[in-house]
Regions:
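Conserved long alpha-helical elements within nucleotide-processing catalytic cores of c-di-GMP signaling
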Residues: 1-5, 9-37, 44-74, 80-89, ...
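Active-site core of bacterial EAL-family cyclic-dinucleotide phosphodiesterase domains
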Residues: 21, 175-232, 270, 331
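The catalytic core of metal-dependent phosphodiesterases that act on cyclic dinucleotides
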Residues: 47, 84, 283-338
Length: 338
């Protein structure tokens, strides 16, 4: 019976038992005129832990995270594991008792102690979504759905953030789903553009290089900012595919400039951490250079300092390989916290 109702890794109630407990809690809250809160909790960057350190270490982090949360709960509260790195919490709030905001602040505080990963202190944060009974719903499935909606928007707002559910969020979620659909269609049709921004030397005022900038004009809408669609490409797992297209398009453009007698301009291409970790960046670049018969020194790979710190061994290995074949490497946002 315990195996059927409890998660074997964390020892917490599983999804089915959590739903049953929530239904009972809602009945009790209605009878006693209490407030009830459902809080969904998602670890940020948990996928990177699995990619960098392996799933066994990821399981260890999740188990310790669950234990830390359990230690700061009241007797009447229930913590369960819903799926993957997502936990959920039932808070029974009696009159005069501290509300969900205070509990989330306590959880955030216990997370501030870093986790030990192979001897390294690794900070972790989570995102939280909060739905309240009776304001946001009276059924278990509706409260969990609304808490998940709020958590999704908390993740978009930044790490270590929480959001209370509001009806307006449904409009925002619908808009995001429409944006995702349009973006998937753009990837399928390769409906992006690459703009080229010249780099001007201060000493002589001459063009000393070019930076490639990815742009997307969504049909029927204003141009979408890269600050919006690039993170969305990453969350949809499409950034490597688009990044490969950009690299090939840039190499094609460099070759065209050479044929037109414009000389040999070095072009910088921005690369995301996910493109390095999950894609095949080195082979993508080598293939495009060969296809367009380009000297590798005409291509510059630019990544942020934060990207460099994700999955560091693989990232460094890829960058060293690119450097060895002649591709220039540059770091953007240097000195921003690492």
């Amino acid at each position: 019976l315990k195996m059927a109702n409890y998660d074997p890794l964390t020892g917490l109630p599983n999804r089915d038992l959590f739903y049953t407990t929530l239904q009972m809690g809602l009945t009790q809250a209605a009878l006693r005129d209490w407030q009830l809160a459902v809080v969904t909790i998602g670890l940020n960057d948990f996928k990177n832990i699995n990619l960098t350190w392996g799933h066994l270490m990821g399981d260890k982090v999740l188990a310790e995270f669950s234990q830390r949360l359990s230690n700061c709960l009241n007797v009447s509260d229930t913590l369960g594991r819903m799926d993957g790195d997502e936990l959920a919490l039932i808070l029974m709030i009696r009159k005069g008792q501290a509300g969900p905001r205070q509990m989330v602040d306590r959880i955030r505080e216990v997370l501030r102690d870093p986790f030990k990963l192979h001897g390294h202190d690794t900070p972790m944060t989570a995102s939280y979504g909060i739905a309240l009974y009776p304001d946001d719903g009276a059924e278990a499935h509706r409260l969990i759905k609304h808490a998940n909606t709020a958590m999704g928007l908390a993740k978009q707002a930044g790490k270590d953030t929480y959001r209370f559910y509001t009806a307006q969020m449904n409009v925002e979620v619908m808009a995001r789903q429409e944006l995702e659909t349009a973006l998937r269609d753009a990837v399928r049709k390769q409906a992006f553009e690459v703009y080229y921004q010249p780099k001007i030397g201060l000493a002589d005022g001459r063009i000393c290089g070019v930076e490639a900038l990815l742009r997307w004009h969504r049909p029927g809408h204003a141009a979408v900012s890269p600050a919006v669609f690039v993170p969305l490409l990453e969350s949809l797992g499409l950034i490597s595919r688009v990044g490969q297209w950009v690299i090939d398009r840039v190499c094609s453009q460099i070759a065209q400039w050479q044929r037109s007698g414009l000389g040999s301009l070095q072009v910088a291409v921005n690369v995301s951490a996910q493109q390095i970790c999950e894609g095949d960046l080195v082979n993508d670049i080598e293939r495009s250079l060969k296809a367009h018969q380009l000297d590798p020194h005409l291509l510059e790979v630019e990544l942020t300092e934060g990207s460099l710190m994700e999955n560091t061994p693989h990232t460094v290995s890829s960058l060293l390989t690119l450097r060895d074949i002649g591709v220039k490497i540059s770091i953007d946002d240097f000195g921003t916290g690492y």
